C-alpha cells in the first residue's frame, strides 16, 4: 500500500481511515508500518479483550504522540486490516497513557457505505452501552502489561474531533515542510 497516496480528507466532511484492527478480533494489537506498507503484530495483549470498534488511523496526519491520528470506526461488521474506509467524525474519546495524550476520534461510515448511520451525527446519538464498552476497553486493555496504563479523561464533541483532525493535518504538513 502506498500510504502517501491516501489523503486525510476524502472531502470537506469525510475522512479516510486505514483500518489496523478489526472490531471483535482477538487480543492482538496490529500496527501499520508507514515505511513498508505492511501490517505488523505490535504485541499480543495480555487481557482477553477485543476492540469494540474497528481501529485505525487517518493517513497524512500527525498527533501529539508522533503517530497518525487514531480513529475508532463504529460499524456493524469487522473491516479487514489495511482497508481504507470513508467516515464522518462524530466526537472524540479523550485519554492519556504512559506516553502522554492519546485521543481517539470516534467516526461512523459515510452514507455511501452504510445509510444506517445517517442518524448518528454526534456522540450523544450513539448507544450509551457502546460508549461504556469503549471506555471500559480502553481503561482495561493494558491492565496486565508492565509499565503501561491508560486514563480516560472524558469525551469531546464533533467540533473537538474536527479540530484535532485539522491539527493533525497541519502538524504533518509542518513536519514535511521543515
From Swiss-Prot:
KW Cytoplasm (keyword) present: yes
EC main group: hydrolase
Catalytic reaction equation(s): diphosphate + H2O = 2 phosphate + H(+)
Classification via Gene3D superfamilies: Inorganic pyrophosphatase
Pfam families: Pyrophosphatase (PF00719)
Entry keyword set: Cytoplasm, Hydrolase, Magnesium, Metal-binding
Annotated residues for binding of Mg(2+) 1: 65, 70, 102
Gene Ontology MF annotations: inorganic diphosphate phosphatase activity; magnesium ion binding
Positions annotated to bind substrate: 29, 43, 55, 141
InterPro entries for the chain: Pyrophosphatase, Pyrophosphatase_sf
Binding positions (Mg(2+) 2): 70
Subunit structure: Homohexamer.
Name by which UniProt lists this protein: Inorganic pyrophosphatase
